[in-house]
């Protein structure tokens, strides 16, 4: 029986989105508490009940912590960027929590993690969006990340 693995950084990205979602939903600014909750979930594979038996899940703890800490440190800048990419008829206060969490983490990695190529960040978070969001939101994520990547490239 062969063992399947999912990329550790991909899992770290999903976990970071979950941590930021928890931060928004619970209005909990205790970053260490949030990270510990999410890490304990992933470190206990028994808590993930719908996985195929031979699928092993582990995350890059360093990447996860770096993403969450970076989002917390840059949250106001990230929200400003997100809100600036909304059309005039969209109210930032009505943005779905999961969409905002995913955008915070993805934009953070795009702007503040220069070792990860923009194309990888866009592909990874579009894939994550595919599993978590509706079709319109997936397109929005892809569009925003693409625009930010192009803007960021011009600034370098």
UniProtKB/Swiss-Prot annotation:
**Superkingdom of this protein's organism:** Bacteria
Q: Name one GO biological process term.
A: DNA-templated transcription termination
Tell whether ATP-binding is among the UniProt keywords: no
UniProt keywords, alphabetically: RNA-binding, Transcription, Transcription antitermination, Transcription regulation
Identify the InterPro entries for this entry. NusB-like_sf, NusB_fam, NusB_RsmB_TIM44
Task: Kindly list the GO CC terms recorded for this protein.
Answer: cytosol
Q: Any idea which GO molecular function terms this record carries?
A: RNA binding
Function field: Involved in transcription antitermination. Required for transcription of ribosomal RNA (rRNA) genes. Binds specifically to the boxA antiterminator sequence of the ribosomal RNA (rrn) operons.
Q: Which NCBIfam families match?
A: nusB
- Annotated family: Belongs to the NusB family.
Tell me what this protein is called.
Answer: Transcription antitermination protein NusB
In which organism is this protein found? Rickettsia peacockii (strain Rustic)
Q: Which gene encodes it?
A: nusB
